[in-house]
Amino acid sequence: MSGKMNEWESLNTTLNRFTDNVVKFRRDSRTKALKCWRPIVDGIVDYVKRKDDRFHALSVFHKGSYYERSKVGEPDEFDLMLVMDNLELYDEPFEEDDGLSEPPIGFTTVMIDQGEEKPWKRDECVNRRGMLNATRVKAVFKRLADEAIQDMKSKGHWRNVTVKSGGTAVTLKISKDGREYSVDLTLGIKDNTWPEDAEEWKTRQRKGWPKRNLVHDIHEMGCHLVTKQPKGHSPIEQERGFLWCYSFSEAEKKLFLQGEQGEVNSCRRQVLRILKALREELELQPLKSYHLKTLLLYECESQPSARQWSKDALSERFLDLLKRLEKCLRSKECPHYFIKDLNLFEMLNPEKCDELADRVNKILKQPGQVLIRLIK
């Protein structure tokens, strides 16, 4: 047993060195990044609010790894959700026929209340039944963001800013002082009800993490709906634009920031940041940061005690998370943390999963040596 303890202590030391040399980013870099993009985002949001009354109630919700304090490397990527507060949903899902097929798991549709759909008829953002088209709403926002940037460029400002649209977000690319910052702006609607697709999460049998009161608070908080198209599903083509994806960014942020309350020396976020850094340094694509975050949340449920996440247990938790990752890659299954029937690995190439599993296994066999080679 003492031999195993010595191995863990040695790996702990190496993991902490790796964190200091590879994972952490400097505070001055963070301040410089925020000063660069914040005025631009504020300017775009203000312009959009003024120019189109459908977006008059936009509010900014900070999401993603930077705001969960799990960002690795330089602070050059940021995720913001722009919540359309005027479309906040309180009611249970509507019962009337919306004329659309059943949405794939993880997605839903939004019906604008009768009498409130008139402004959304512009740009064909709603159909004749009052169903809100996510794709068209996002396109309108991108057009307005483009206009805002061109307006500022005509006044001699923001010459270093470009905007593009892809996936869930409208992305700003900002170049300054030899660095490029990327800011994803995702349109969202607050849904104060908890989705039926995620009902299992509320009643899931747990060993103590997250605590019942936190589960209750998150359930009562609801979720967001964002403009994201489904992958791996084949809804009727003309219906794809009407699909809104459930987002649990607010719940995830709450889990990371409140799930550790009272755990002064927790290594939860450090383990995640190390895994993210390994993904980047070893080019373990197409694994995404979200996959690793999902696996960490499951590992937190499996190891619920604060003692199991103490700084002294860093090496054990690191190895356990790697084992969980290898197992999921072997089985080609990574269940969404909130919607367990949704497989996040569904679109990954099976052969690529096997290849990644083999690479993770090699790390497990010689974790210290792999980390030392990457320390600069």
Curated annotation (Swiss-Prot):
GO terms for biological process: innate immune response. The keyword Transferase applies. Keywords: ATP-binding, Immunity, Innate immunity, Magnesium, Manganese, Metal-binding, Nucleotide-binding, Nucleotidyltransferase, RNA-binding, Transferase. One of its GO terms (molecular function) is ATP binding. Mg(2+) binds at residues 77, 79. InterPro entries: Mab-21-like_nuc_Trfase, Mab-21_HhH/H2TH-like, MAB21L/cGLR. It comes from the Eukaryota. Its cofactor is Mg(2+); Mn(2+). It holds the Pfam family Mab-21_C. It catalyses: UTP + ATP = 3',3'-cUAMP + 2 diphosphate. Its EC number is 2.7.7.-. It is an enzyme of class 2 (transferase). Belongs to the mab-21 family. Nucleotidyltransferase that catalyzes the formation of cyclic UMP-AMP (3',3'-cUAMP) from ATP and UTP and plays a key role in innate immunity. Acts as a key sensor of double-stranded RNA (dsRNA), the presence of dsRNA in the cytoplasm being a danger signal that triggers the immune responses. Directly binds dsRNA, activating the nucleotidyltransferase activity, leading to synthesis of 3',3'-cUAMP, a second messenger that binds to and activates Sting, thereby triggering the immune response via activation of the NF-kappa-B transcription factor. This is Cyclic GMP-AMP synthase-like receptor 1. The lineage of its organism: Eukaryota, Metazoa, Cnidaria, Anthozoa, Hexacorallia. The gene is cGLR1.
